[in-house]
């Protein structure tokens, strides 16, 4: 199931083309989430836009840069694996494209306000 991306600011009117772009970005992220080497250039090529145009469009629609969006998607996806109880924090970090479990844990804590281990404790299935 795709992760939710919070769109901001609320005043932004989203056209069908914008929604199509966001859905395409989310599909690409879903398909490539485990790849630690994905780049913004690859995403731009996939959606058929130049890097700068895509940056401006994604930033305008989501309030996040493409890099921030990729990271947020990975961290949201990690919650799915952590909640399942089937994967350790390290295994989860690799499944969502982090090559360094320590960096994953720090990023997770910064994003959610708690460590992955605490998240697991609070969300036992």
What are these regions (language model features)?
Residues 1-3:
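The C-terminal output helix
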Residues 60-99, 121-125:
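Terminal helix-turn-helix DNA-binding modules in bacterial transcription factors
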Residues 46, 95-96, 111:
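Residues within the alpha-helical elements of helix-turn-helix
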Residues 106-125:
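…primarily DNA-binding HTH/wHTH and HhH modules…
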Residues 54, 58, 103-104, 108:
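Short hydrophobic/aromatic patch on the recognition helix
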Residues 11-37, 68-87:
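A short, Lys/Arg-enriched amphipathic alpha-helix from helix-turn-helix/homeodomain DNA-binding modules
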Residues 41, 52, 88-91, 101-102, ...:
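Residues within helix-turn-helix
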Residues 32, 36-49, 53-56:
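Non-catalytic interaction/regulatory modules that flank or connect domains
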């Amino acid at each position: 199931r795709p992760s939710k991306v919070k769109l901001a600011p609320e005043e932004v009117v989203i056209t069908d083309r914008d929604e199509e772009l966001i859905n395409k970005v989310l599909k690409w992220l879903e398909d490539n989430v485990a790849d630690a080497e994905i780049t913004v250039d690859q995403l731009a090529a996939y959606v058929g836009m130049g890097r700068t145009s895509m940056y401006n469009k994604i930033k305008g629609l989501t309030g996040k840069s493409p890099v921030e969006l990729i990271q947020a998607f990975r961290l949201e996806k990690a919650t799915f694996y952590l909640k399942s109880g089937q994967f350790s924090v390290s295994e989860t970090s690799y499944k969502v494209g982090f090559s360094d479990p320590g960096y994953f844990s720090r990023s997770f804590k910064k994003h959610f306000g708690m460590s992955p281990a605490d998240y697991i404790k609070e969300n036992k299935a």
